[in-house]
């Protein structure tokens, strides 16, 4: 960690991104707090929802604004950890942290309705996110995007939007947007796991370095300009990422693929469990209601 300080505070902690995340968090607490009365049918937000949303924002800053983002430009396994948290773990936390009445307000806008109608359909959301994620990690695409000051943030924003749309059919609480039954939700998550496997397998089982931005000095220096001021880079006597490598490049690459798969399995497994137990609880309540409707002598039996 001490070696990273040579890149400066701005590269390590991204103060502008921190301010942006802090602004979102303040806005959230203002909306669910003093401004809640301005929304129709607004009720008090549970501590669980506040925890979910706050954790999502903190995690997003941790991987995108903290040292993880900088390390991810030097070590591929750190990059994959960043991607896993940002696109697999953060979106469900944010969605679970938004109250129903705020969803109702947001979806009252025609533009939002059109976006959800087009991009949040389960099959479209499923294939768009997993397709974009796999396409992004094709070596030629990855290296090109990583070296572009314009393409990189645009691609990350598109991926994040696609991730939110992928999670929408699973976790939104609005009856009018419940396009999947509980059993279909389980199948949806299993399909997500299957579709993401080829991209992970390509990286895990590769026997040679795939990405020039982690092996070629010129490509790496260009990629580092995304998070380190150009003036700082020119003053440093660094020729490549080797000074921070603690494992061979191929092993680091394979570790990155494994990390992505592990995080994906943990999060998807947790959501599958969440959906299953919610479904089981509803079925038990339904059985109790049906039992209460029976005559007393049949209930005893």
State each model region's role.
Residues 1-301:
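Alpha-helical membrane segments of multi-pass proteins
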